[in-house]
């Protein structure tokens, strides 16, 4: 989310990176020569959860069909928001703003390079392109091989594109100004009378409508930047975003703001998770799922998560 106070963003991003790091340095990954064959071998059960044809030979780099031969093209939105994409040294490669996907810094940047590594692609063989959020899961041909951009799995999205197995389980949350009475809310019942806003087409908006169900209709914004501006202008009492984004908003984008709380998934329901986006029926889907399974199995994904994302336990939970 693009900050109106860009002059402060670089310093604050650096502070956040230090606060969320488990010790700094590059996140652990498989060896540079690792291939999808190794990924599948590292997780024998993976083949049962992906397409039956996902064999080691089928996922060897030389057999993969990609947009550009020998390259893995990865899409994400611009600005590339922290904590998913970071610029600890304050320098971003054009055209990227706020965060830089190309440097391997930040949760999703590190994750994307780890997936690429499992598929046999060196960092120099990964090409990043700008893909607006809504476009990533819209029907039609894709200019990317994979898209990594905080896209939550939804059945309706899966009708138009392939969505991978989850790589991060998340909770939605509320950000408010400290001076607003909503800041003391503890339960969903406490939230009913307030006005909420979120970006269009997001699971954050779904949370307002289906979980909070306030008396006033949600205010829908075209982007998170606009939603943040609405919070600052007091058009809304609460901004609903995923929890990692909430940590960034309160630390770097909205002065005197607070995380009111996060929503735990209702008992008996599946937790929300981020998925990699691929073209419908992509030949890479099974191999990407195998790579994700291997990253979970060997501990790489857990290490990346701990390095770049704040502990969920540090935010209060809104009670039913």
Where are the regions that the model predicts?
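Acidic, polar ligand-binding/catalytic clefts
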Residues: 124-190
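C-terminal motif of bacterial Sec signal peptides marking the signal peptidase cleavage site
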Residues: 15-19
């Amino acid at each position: 989310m693009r900050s109106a106070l860009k002059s402060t963003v670089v310093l604050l991003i650096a502070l956040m990176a230090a606060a969320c790091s488990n010790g700094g340095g590059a996140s652990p990954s498989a060896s540079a020569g690792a291939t999808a064959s190794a990924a599948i071998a590292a997780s024998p059960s993976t083949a049962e959860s992906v397409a039956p044809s996902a064999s080691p030979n089928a996922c060897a780099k030389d057999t993969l069909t990609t947009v550009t031969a020998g390259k893995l093209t990865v899409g994400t939105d611009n600005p590339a928001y922290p904590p998913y994409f970071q610029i600890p040294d304050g320098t971003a490669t054009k055209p990227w703003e706020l965060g830089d996907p190309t440097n391997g810094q930040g949760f999703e940047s590190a994750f994307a390079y780890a997936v690429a590594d499992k598929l046999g692609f060196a960092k120099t063989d990964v090409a990043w392109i700008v893909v607006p959020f809504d476009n990533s899961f819209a029907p039609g041909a894709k200019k990317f091989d994979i898209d990594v951009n905080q896209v939550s799995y939804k059945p309706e999205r899966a009708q138009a594109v392939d969505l991978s197995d989850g790589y991060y389980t998340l909770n939605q949350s509320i950000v408010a100004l400290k001076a607003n009475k909503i800041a003391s809310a503890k339960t969903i019942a406490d939230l009913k009378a307030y006005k909420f806003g979120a970006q269009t087409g997001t699971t954050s908006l779904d949370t307002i409508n289906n979980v909070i169900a306030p008396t006033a209709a949600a205010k829908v914004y075209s982007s998170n930047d606009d939603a943040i501006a609405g919070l600052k202008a007091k058009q809304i009492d609460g901004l609903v975003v995923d929890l990692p984004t909430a940590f960034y908003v309160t630390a770097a984008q909205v002065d005197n703001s607070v995380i009111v709380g996060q929503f735990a998934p209702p008992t008996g329901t599946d937790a929300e998770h981020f998925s990699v986006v691929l073209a419908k029926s992509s030949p890479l889907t099974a191999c990407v799922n195998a790579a994700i399974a291997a990253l979970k199995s060997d501990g790489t994904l857990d290490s990346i998560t701990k390095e770049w994302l704040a502990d969920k336990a540090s935010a209060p939970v809104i009670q039913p």
